[in-house]
């Protein structure tokens, strides 16, 4: 695989659990990935959570409004603090190691966004799932990705618990409430609001996005930290061209890459505000 940074695939990976990387095509079958544009000059070490969220707080933008939901409104600093606390829960209470797959289940909400950032900060791999999926479909995803951890909206726990009976790898599950209550919030409330992001490689996998399976069994597509930042550097400024006070809103779920990009990754990459239209 050819890259602008000159690093070989997997060089310096931070992942302890290498299950996902081992499922990539062998290097001779990988495409040449050319990052030649000025905005795509990524170094060999990259954690996209640092770039999408932490850098804004470090640059003095922490008080700026970031996410609005039905139950809460967070600034960039508040989102960072919540994500840091949840990352600590994942690592300290749930035993997450870099490279573990974490299933995320919930409607669009600031809390689900914080969970996504927590997984990425901790070096995990986020596996978003549609709220409408039932136990059989969830079990297929857990089995294919060998998911080990899950963070789930308490209102959607029943189907995940049914799926869990068929999935021996899924040993760690915590539930959250979009209004800030629930088991996960209780654990997070005792944690410091700081977290040292895992020093992931630019080509470490941070996301497995499953297709809808309309033509057969859903397939998991693997995305690197660098992929997330490359999309953020290209599409918003050159196609969408948002203005300074624009607010992002939409109905696509964060489990779809279209929703994850359009409602979370792209707005935060350019210091904008997202209003979540619905939470289930």
Give the label of every model feature segment:
Residues 50-78:
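AMP-dependent adenylate-forming
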Residues 268-280:
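Short membrane-interfacial helix/loop motifs at transmembrane-helix boundaries
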Residues 72-74, 89-136, 251-253:
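Conserved AMP-binding/adenylate-forming
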């Amino acid at each position: 695989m050819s890259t602008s940074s000159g690093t070989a695939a997997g060089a310096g990976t931070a992942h302890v659990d290498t299950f996902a990387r081992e499922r990539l095509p062998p290097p001779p079958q990988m495409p040449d990935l050319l990052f030649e544009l000025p905005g795509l000059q990524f170094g060999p070490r990259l954690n996209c959570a640092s770039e999408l969220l932490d850098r804004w707080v470090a640059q003095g933008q922490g008080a700026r409004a970031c996410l609005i939901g039905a139950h809460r409104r967070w600034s960039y600093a508040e989102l960072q603090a919540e994500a840091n606390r949840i990352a600590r829960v994942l690592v300290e209470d749930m035993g997450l190691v870099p490279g573990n797959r974490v299933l995320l289940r919930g409607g669009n909400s600031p809390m689900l966004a914080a969970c996504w950032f927590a997984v990425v900060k901790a070096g995990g791999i986020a596996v978003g799932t549609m709220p409408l999926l039932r136990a059989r479909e969830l079990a297929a995803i857990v089995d294919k990705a060998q998911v080990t951890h899950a963070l789930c909206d308490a209102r959607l726990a029943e189907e995940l618990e049914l799926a869990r009976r068929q999935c021996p790898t899924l040993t760690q599950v915590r539930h959250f409430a979009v209004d800030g209550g629930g088991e996960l919030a209780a654990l997070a409330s005792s944690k410091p609001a700081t977290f040292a992001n895992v020093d992931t490689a630019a080509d470490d996998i941070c996301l497995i996005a499953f297709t809808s399976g309309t033509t057969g069994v859903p397939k998991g597509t693997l995305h690197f930290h660098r992929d997330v930042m490359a999309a953020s550097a290209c599409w918003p400024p050159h196609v969408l061209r948002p203005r300074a006070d624009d607010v992002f809103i939409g109905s696509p779920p964060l489990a779809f890459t279209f929703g994850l990009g359009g409602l979370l990754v792209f707005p935060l990459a350019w210091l904008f505000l997202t209003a979540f239209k619905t939470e289930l």
